[in-house]
Swiss-Prot record:
Predominant subcellular localization, coarse grouping: membrane
Organism: Sus scrofa (Pig)
Coiled coil: none
Positions in the Extracellular compartment: 27-102, 165-176, 245-272, 352-363
The keyword Transferase appears for this protein: no
Record-given protein name: Endothelin receptor type B
Alphabetized GO MF terms: endothelin receptor activity; peptide hormone binding
Any Pfam family hit: 7tm_1
Annotated family: Belongs to the G-protein coupled receptor 1 family. Endothelin receptor subfamily. EDNRB sub-subfamily.
Length: 443
């Protein structure tokens, strides 16, 4: 009996040790937790996609916790009774991403890369070449497309490589640059959508503001502010992300992640509150601003509908089309980023490391998170497609530009530009007559 008990004891110790090693390895190559993730965000979850994960509740650590014994105080005795910690039961198997999701993520990323470069570069070319497309809303859309293009060119290829190679060979500089560009791109998207919603309300509320050709000074100031604020808000990503080195199965792996031990109190607070900050500013803010100003715009249009003349019908139709286009862009943004933010919030609110059913929840959240990553990446290429489907003017310009890319854009669009410019002038003349008649009638 004694040899049998000794053998069972050794087997039990070996099993516990194996589970501990598996947990440490899983944590070392784990899924970026609350503080190490954004929505790209356009964010750290795409910088270091996981193959295995271990999520401690309320922790932002991605490194194994220290297993050293507690320090002995002076005198050789502990200050109190030894603390007893309840270790949660280990999962039956590692929570990991299967190869199927890797292939799906790679295919989606390649599609986003190709469609995003073609769509956003074509959109920028249309607005740059076509003089009648150079107005306030379209310049904001061009700013949004430029931010998406930077994210697509720099971030997506590196993210695909990181997922397949499970190593970070690009150095510390790229480890800081990739999440910085990704977060700046998301900030440009969010603030541009907010500016577009406000611009549409101003266009409807002030009927004397006729849409013309060229970039208004206020729009130029808005674009500069959007880029400056987006870059400033992305600076904590560059400061917080770092590259660590760890040994795994005899191999030396380099991992890029939001470091679990930050140097300053501000960065420690940022790491702790990052998911809630991303959800509130980068997701809820554009939706709230769009809902508020579009409600005001609808009330304004219903109130002033009786005072419109037939001469302004074409002008109002153009404004309604632009308003519909902006609303479509905001809706696409919400649909693309909802799964990723939902997985983060569910992880923060529902996960409990002492729950016996936490392994099933981890598997669900990991799948939901990867779906969210792919959906968020899709937002970088879907805006030109949405403009093509919603706006007739953009649809005609896309057809002409894509079908005749090697030909001179001015030669193909000269007649359409002249007709559009004459149409604007006619609308302006009709509106001036309408204002003059109202002025004399009121007098």
């Amino acid at each position: 009996m004694q040899p049998l008990r000794s053998l069972c004891g050794r087997a039990l110790v070996a099993l516990i040790f194996a589970c501990g090693v598996a947990g440490v390895q899983s944590e070392e190559r784990g899924f970026p937790p609350a503080g190490a993730t954004p929505p790209a965000l356009r964010t750290g979850e795409i910088v270091a996609p996981p193959t295995k994960t271990f999520w401690p509740r309320g922790s932002n650590a991605s490194l194994p916790r220290s297993s050293s014994p507690p320090q002995m105080p002076k005198g050789g005795r502990m200050a109190g009774p030894p603390a007893r910690t309840l270790t949660p039961p280990p999962c039956e198997g590692p929570i990991e991403i299967k190869d199927t999701f890797k292939y799906i993520n790679t295919v989606v990323s390649c599609l986003v890369f190709v469609l995003g470069i073609i769509g956003n570069s074509t959109l920028l070319r249309i607005i740059y070449k076509n003089k009648c497309m150079r107005n306030g809303p379209n310049i904001l859309i061009a700013s949004l497309a430029l931010g998406d293009l930077l994210h697509i060119i720099i971030d997506i290829p590196i993210n695909v490589y990181k997922l397949l190679a499970e190593d970070w060979p690009f150095g510390v500089e790229m480890c800081k640059l990739v999440p910085f560009i990704q977060k700046a791109s998301v900030g440009i998207t969010v603030l541009s959508l907010c500016a577009l919603s406000i611009d549409r309300y101003r266009a409807v509320a002030s009927w004397s503001r006729i849409k013309g050709i060229g970039v208004p000074k206020w729009t130029a100031v808005e674009i500069v502010l959007i880029w400056v604020v987006s870059v400033v808000l992305a600076v904590p990503e560059a400061l917080g992300f770092d590259m660590i080195t760890t040994d795994y199965k005899g191999n030396r792996l380099r991992i890029c992640l939001l470091h679990p031990t930050q140097k300053t109190a501000f960065m420690q607070f940022y790491k702790t509150a990052k998911d809630w900050w991303l959800f509130s500013f980068y997701f809820c803010l554009p939706l709230a601003i769009t809902a508020f100003f579009y409600t005001l715009m609808t009330c304004e249009m219903l109130r002033k509908k009786s005072g419109m003349q037939i001469a302004l019908n074409d002008h109002l139709k153009q404004r309604r089309e632009v308003a519909k286009t902006v609303f479509c862009l905001v809706l696409v943004f919400a649909l693309c980023w909802l799964p990723l933010h939902l997985s983060r919030i569910l992880k923060l609110t529902l996960y409990d490391q002492n729950d016996s059913n936490r392994c099933e929840l981890l598997s669900f959240l990991l799948v939901l998170d990867y779906i969210g990553i792919n959906m968020a990446s899709l937002n970088s290429c879907i805006n030109p497609i949405a403009l093509y489907l919603v706006s007739k003017r953009f649809k005609n310009c896309f057809k002409s530009c894509l079908c005749c890319w090697c030909q001179s854009f001015e030669e193909k669009q000269s007649l359409e530009e002249k007709q559009s410019c004459l149409k604007f002038k006619a609308n302006d003349h009709g509106y001036d007559n309408f204002r003059s008649s109202n002025k004399y009638s009121s007098s």
